[in-house]
Amino acid sequence: MCRSGLLETVAANRCLLFTLAVALVVRLVLAVVIQHRVDQPPSRLCLIAGDAEGYWELAQHLVAMEDFAIYEPPRYVLRVPGFPVVLAMSQALFGSNVFATRCLLACIGTAACGLTYWLGRELVDETTGLIAAVYTALSPTMALFSVLILSETLFAFTLLLSLITMVRLVWPNGTNATGRVMGRALVAGGLIGLATLVRPTWLYVGVLIAAVMIVLGAGTRRFKILCLACMLLGVGLSMAPWAVRNSLVTGHLVFTTLWAGPSLYDGLNPQATGDSDMRFVETDRLFEQLSEYEVDREYSRRAWRFAAENPGRVLWLAWKKQQRYWSLVPNADQFRDVRLQVVVFLAVLPLLGFAIYGAWLSQHKPLTLVATTGALLLFAGLHLLFVGSLRYRLPAEYPLSVLAAVGVRQLFLRLKRAA
């Protein structure tokens, strides 16, 4: 490497370290603020009630070496284990200190900023990666969700890891050794499985993105088939322990959870609005009458029957869900403060705007487009059926920031030339 190239690399590394330091400080400050707020009477675990309490209780059961189940009758396959395992690690180290857990999650959120840089460097160059990392470091929604007891940020971290391995698998890099490429495909599949154990939807979205990238990549048809096979093998191996456990517990082969049915019915039922309202689970009391597997299937049947009988209502609900998914301001009632909504709006609007510009600039780079927008668009498709929220878009904004960085960099270059 020439001296100028070495100096540029050193400068880029310093900028990255500074960016990550800022990201960590921002998140730790927010951890203090959020902890102070939730400690106020009536004290609670998280700003957004619901999922956090379940995750925390599952983690407590893991630490105590008890059944991975919550509620009565016990629901053994309600959640995938990825996020509860991370919470259990924190509880094992720091006890029930929620603030310490927020600090650990802040570190994971900071690491996700670093992975965004890595993805940008792999797809474009170091400068683009740095711009994307700066955005993720300062994004108010990304920073805030990093310290909530929710799985979005951990999912973003694992999602980015799997995307990076996919890019390294298919990107032209002079590596022609079949064994090495197959190994990378196996690792990519394993990381897709790991991300699925944090958020089940990645089993479908991640595999589809990987398959499209492999098809679009270089190589013969036989080579691509081998890559796909190794990738799927990696997914299967990484998820096998969870699937076997579920089979032993329920008597059925379940790769993810038995909560898809109730979640689908949440979005497709006579009282649905596009927002989540799971009170029907308590009023129907199906878990007292049927097995967990049967409840999942029953709610799936009810949801699809409602969809078949009410196509117009389903279309209206799909529109409402997309409004919530693509919203530029927070959906949750806890975040209705006008000042917060303005801050989020001013952060999200440039991201989406520059991402559109970056997509236009990258129109002849299909691999870049798939890697940066695939998750965002496929999640949007899923939330035509399931309830919508800005929260579900958040993990996909990390790779999207790379595409936005392409647009930002091009704008700077044009302004520089004009000057």
What are these regions (language model features)?
Residues 23-26, 132-140, 144, 164, ...:
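Short helix- or helix-capping micro-motifs
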Residues 40-53, 57, 64-84, 92-93, ...:
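Membrane-proximal lumenal/periplasmic loop motifs of glycosylation machinery
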Residues 75, 79, 90, 97-107, ...:
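Membrane-embedded glycan-lipid processing machinery
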Residues 100, 306-372, 382:
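Membrane-interface anchor segments at the N-terminal boundary of transmembrane helices
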Residues 103-124, 157, 161-165, 353-357:
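Transmembrane-helix motifs of polytopic, lipid-linked glycan transferases
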Residues 116-138, 156-157, 179, 368-372:
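Transmembrane-helix signature of polytopic, membrane-embedded enzymes
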Residues 126-127, 162-187, 195, 213-219, ...:
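Membrane-interface transmembrane helices that cradle and orient dolichyl/undecaprenyl
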Residues 247-324:
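Membrane-proximal stem/loop segments at transmembrane-domain junctions that anchor or position
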